[in-house]
Design a protein with these regions (language model features):
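Ser/Thr/Pro/Gly-rich low-complexity linker/stalk segments immediately outside membranes or between
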Residues: 29-53
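Helix-loop boundary elements of multi-pass alpha-helical membrane proteins
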Residues: 1-22
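Catalytic toxin/effector domains delivered as secreted proteins or via bacterial secretion systems
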Residues: 49-276
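Seven-transmembrane-like multi-pass membrane architecture, highlighting hydrophobic TM helices
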Residues: 13-16, 20, 28-29, 34-36
Length: 277
């Protein structure tokens, strides 16, 4: 009679091994699930890449046909490459530099509108005055407006479950770094008269910690920008909390004066028909 194999594994051991494997797979799955849900911010917008490509195509064909030769496929890839397979709390401006180069756009002098806590009002104005531009009216801002995105160093996929919150998790996340860099570039390129729409219904109309106060105002160049015209807008029927004579606006005036940029301010209830003073 032939010898039985010495390495035969008993059925009991096989069951134990199978059970152990299932437990290991379950643990890995749970750890991956916890990893994807570890951030406090909203996850990547569904169909992010398709939205970027679609918005780019719409902008270059319909909104600004002068940019029709822009390669939207390359832009989409550069956008994804900026954050895919990277630590979402360690994103740098260098990551976005290829995207910025592909989306270079010249804004005519005296057509730049900045805003702080008045996004909807600013966009209402540019929807009527199509020759004026907020950041979201440029190709770069138009594509990313209202979207969320992030990846992770351990995968080539986007994280649709959670992304870092700029305050609760980390400031150097994909979205925050993008908008800071885009805002810097937008202000840096401005020339002529620059307009800013501020919320006069808030107690702190000019907030030095806002994107306008911490990024845009300090990147306006006096050799190109002759004046900053501020519109302090109050809600219709509301009680004005700030006007052109308060300490908040005086601080803004002081900053522009130090930068040798002329400053004018006007307050109004609701949006004016024209921002020109």
């Amino acid at each position: 009679m032939a010898d039985e194999p010495c390495c035969r594994i008993s059925k009991k051991v096989q069951i134990c091994l199978a059970f152990g494997l299932l437990v290991a797979v379950a643990v890995v799955g749970v750890l991956m699930w916890l990893h994807l849900y570890k951030w406090n911010g909203q996850g990547t917008t569904e169909h992010f890449a398709d939205i970027i490509l679609g918005r780019c195509s719409n902008y270059t064909r319909i909104v600004q046909p002068a940019l029709r030769n822009v390669d939207c496929q390359k832009i989409q890839e550069a956008f994804k490459d900026a954050f895919i397979s990277k630590n979402p709390c360690n994103i740098t401006e260098e990551d976005y530099r290829p995207l910025m180069k592909l989306t270079t756009q010249t804004i005519p002098c005296s057509k730049t509108i900045l805003w702080s806590k008045t996004k909807e009002m600013a966009h209402q104005y540019t929807r009527v005055h199509r020759d004026m531009f907020t950041l979201e009216d440029t190709l770069l801002g138009y594509m990313a407006d209202g979207l969320m995105w992030c990846g992770d160093s351990g995968t080539s996929e986007m994280n649709y479950r959670s992304c870092p919150h700029w305050k609760k998790d980390c400031p150097n996340n994909p979205v925050s770094v993008f908008w800071k860099m885009a805002s810097h570039r937008f202000a840096d390129a401005a020339c002529g008269v620059v307009y800013v729409i501020l919320n006069g219904s808030l107690s702190n109309t000019f907030d030095e910690n806002s994107t306008f106060g911490s990024v845009e105002i300090i990147n306006l160049h006096p050799e190109k920008v002759q004046a900053l015209h501020a519109w302090v807008i109050h809600d219709v029927g509301g009680v004005p909390s700030d006007s052109c004579m308060t300490s908040s606006i005086n601080k803004l005036k002081s900053i522009t004066s130090q930068r040798k940029i002329a400053f004018r301010c006007q307050h109004n209830t609701g949006l004016p028909h024209s921002l020109r003073m």
